[in-house]
Amino acid sequence: GEIFLELIQKFYDIETVVISGKGKWFDNADVVTTFLIARKRNPNTPINQNRTISFCTLKESINEITDVKQLSENILLETDNQFVAVQNYSVNEITNFETIGVPWCGYFANLNWLTEVSEKLIDCNQIFKFTRGERRGWNPLFYPASGHNIEAEYIRPVLKNLRGTSGLYCSADGEAFCCSRSIEELEQLNHTGALQWIRSFENQNNETGVPLTQSLLRANMFWYEMKTDNMADFVANVNYDKSLFIATFVNRSFIDQRMIGLSLKAEFQTEDRVLLLALLNSILSMFFIESFGFGRGLGALDLRATKFERDFKILDFQSLSDGQKQAITDAFQPISQRNRLPLEQEIEQADRTNFERVLLEIFGIAEHYDAIKASLLHLYKIRFAVKD
């Protein structure tokens, strides 16, 4: 998407982007359609930084709008009315939004609050090391079923998915086989459980008939080896539905490839985990998750791990006093102890409203609460418009 936008803007001035906020336009599609109105430009001339681009969201189903000509005129005239919501941003403003990390799919919302709030944020990659579960290619070997008899030192807890997690705390729901010892070492140690496990796969082939001893080979690794570098403290989904959240492990755990792990860097190991959990699950963090993803179809949200690692931000807690940190964790405590709710219900809960107001007040941006909430809801509803 980023490469496409960069390329098209070299040859065209994008003037208007239109998306449906109420139902899909084509019955044979499971995604919401977006179209661009653009004017050809001379690629050798500088881009006018003050030129505005309009981002229009249709408020009604296109099948229910009887006067399409009037609608078209409203879009071209950048007029906000009962049928279309319009946000206008200059090229310079968009460049600033991109620097902050919010991509084009976020510009259908009102982002007039974003520049001021961004001064209070910190890149999460300064605090966390991001990890992904390893894709080793043969789950029966690397994720043993119960009764395997492998020695405990080669077994690590693993979270396969977050479907069984109803709150913000999660625990491993499976086991992973992680052995970096050679066959000779295992024989010397008489670790027969691991040896028998490895040998039970030695003569097996993968789906294409290639022996596992060849298909699973990696540089500087045994064919049966899986690294444990991606143990995580917190975990985010790659695919979100109606609940936007980042969970924390009761005990650090290994993660499956379908999730994004966040491991605290050494200098932040002593930081209060509940404080970090609160910041990762604020309405502001939910906005970033929603704006970073793209609709995969039928309302599902896909996150690109590279984008998430590069641009995900939280409020910068480093200059807060101990009293301010305590006030945040106290306000967050009721949320952390209950089940999560679908977003539209979640943000209306009394404990959620209290937490967000306490949090934003401490950071001096409480006046933006309603705008942040409205922006999040606007993008969320666009994603689910395909189901309308």
Residue ranges and their predicted role:
Residues 313, 372, 381-388:
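Non-globular, low-complexity intrinsically disordered regions
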Residues 11-16, 40-44, 205, 284-288, ...:
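A generic secondary-structure signal for well-formed alpha-helical elements
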Residues 1-136, 257:
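Signature of N6-adenine DNA methyltransferases within the class I
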Residues 3, 309-370:
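Extended amphipathic alpha-helical segments enriched in small hydrophobics
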Residues 327-328, 373-381:
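Short linear loop/turn motifs
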Residues 95-98, 102-330, 334, 340:
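Polybasic, glycine- and aromatic-enriched phosphate-binding surface used to engage nucleic acids
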